[in-house]
């Protein structure tokens, strides 16, 4: 099974204060756009020869850091720890959304991995519960469970859906590659 995690833009990003925990409070509009990565999940038989419960591969744009820190792996392990019946899997991420660009590509990948596992293995978790798991992965991850225009506050984890349709407009996104 494959899903295509889209990214988002922030409209009117306003940093309202610095928090004691090192994060910033913000007020912004998260708007999903159709620029996507791809996450594929293939279940393996429980008697597979892999020692790990997940075999992860990646293509496309490179992702800095250790593979073990990839948010897709973290999402799989988060659910696997709570639902031990989830079988071992082959997981592949094809990355087209640049990292560190403020587009939420990594957050989308984590949230969509939760959605993918929920659907593929019939966990039947409601959106509220998936959002709670997503928040453990990152502040803006719950947005991608909803994946509709939202007014976001706090660290980005507090969202309120907005009736905003910008489909009649075109966007030019420039990534200067400075991150």
Where are these regions (language model features)?
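DPxDG-like acidic metal-binding loop motif
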Residues: 101-127, 143
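A short coil-to-beta-strand element that immediately follows conserved catalytic motifs
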Residues: 11, 86-91
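N-terminal, positively charged, Ser/Thr/Ala/Gly-biased leader segments
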Residues: 1-55, 59
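Short, basic phosphate-binding NTP loop
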Residues: 75-83
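Globin-like tetrapyrrole-binding proteins
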Residues: 72
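ATP-dependent small-molecule kinase catalytic core of the GHMP/sugar-kinase superfamily
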Residues: 2-5, 12-28, 122-179
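Short pre-catalytic strand/loop immediately N-terminal to key active-site residues, enriched for Gly-Thr
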Residues: 89-102
């Amino acid at each position: 099974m494959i899903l295509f995690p889209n990214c988002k833009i922030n409209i009117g990003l306003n940093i309202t204060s610095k928090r004691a925990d090192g994060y910033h409070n913000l007020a912004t509009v998260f708007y999903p756009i159709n620029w996507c990565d791809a996450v594929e999940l293939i279940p393996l038989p429980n008697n597979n020869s892999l020692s790990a419960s997940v075999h992860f591969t990646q293509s496309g744009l490179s992702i800095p850091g250790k593979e073990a820190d990839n948010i897709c792996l973290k999402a799989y392990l988060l659910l696997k720890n709570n639902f031990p019946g989830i079988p071992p899997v082959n997981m592949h991420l094809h990355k087209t959304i640049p990292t560190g660009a403020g587009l939420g590509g990594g957050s989308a990948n984590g949230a969509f991995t939760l959605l993918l596992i929920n659907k593929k293995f019939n966990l039947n978790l409601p959106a509220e519960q998936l959002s709670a798991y997503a928040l453990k992965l990152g502040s803006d991850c719950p947005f991608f469970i909803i994946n509709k225009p939202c007014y976001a506050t706090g660290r980005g984890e507090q969202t309120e859906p907005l009736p905003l349709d910008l489909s009649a407009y075109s966007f030019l996104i420039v990534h200067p590659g400075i991150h």
